[in-house]
Amino acid sequence: MNIPQVVSPQEWRAARQNLLAREKEVTHAKDAVDAARRELPVTEVTKDYTFTGPGGQVSLAGLFGGRRQLITYHFMWRHEQSGFPDEDQGCPTCSFLADSIGDLSHLHACDTTLVLVSRAPIASIERFQKRMGWAVPWYSSAGSDFNYDFHASFDEGKAPLEYNYKDKETLQRETPYIRSGTDGPGVSVFLREGDQVFHTYSAYARGLDSLLGTYRWLDLTPLGRQRHVTGFPYRDTYDQEP
């Protein structure tokens, strides 16, 4: 196995200090971007969306659970309509991300609710959630325009084809796998003020990188990420890898 250059402790320290300066530049740049994100304008959500959870139907406002902020992760689902005729389960890449979600107490203490949303029947969601052992609340948006309006599911009969702020022409040229009938991963954030709900932010594709906890740890190592994000299987199937 090839390893990085072997040097003296003094040389290593000098190289590490050089990298530290670059890391601090990135940290300061990220601080500025995070501040700009908090200052984004918002749009009011006036459309009624209905979701189905373990306790029955709930509105978008109901997903907040009485808190002021709501983060929804658009969890892709594998089924016949999305091009997987022999499957009825969550996307393995979205599962890789969900495996990084820990206890939600700290989010709740900051007046923030995190939920997963999928365009799948609630019975299928509950079966898969039990298999994976996740405690994060998970809702079905089946029959709702929610996924389409926030550009995480694609049906030109419901909404113009758009993903990651790219129009249909750009998508057909750059990412032809984004097409009607499919889903895309994403996260959408909402703020509640009394009875009003506002959409504040949505991110897709590489914009979700910071949510991948496994990558955060691997990025600290000399071998790095090693696998593309789509190369991670369901965590309970590693013993089936060749």
PLM segments and residue spans:
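Residues at the C-termini of beta-strands that transition into short coil/loop
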Residues: 118, 140-142
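Non-globular targeting/processing and membrane-anchoring segments
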Residues: 1-110, 127-133, 137, 144-242
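Catalytic nucleophile loop
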Residues: 109-125
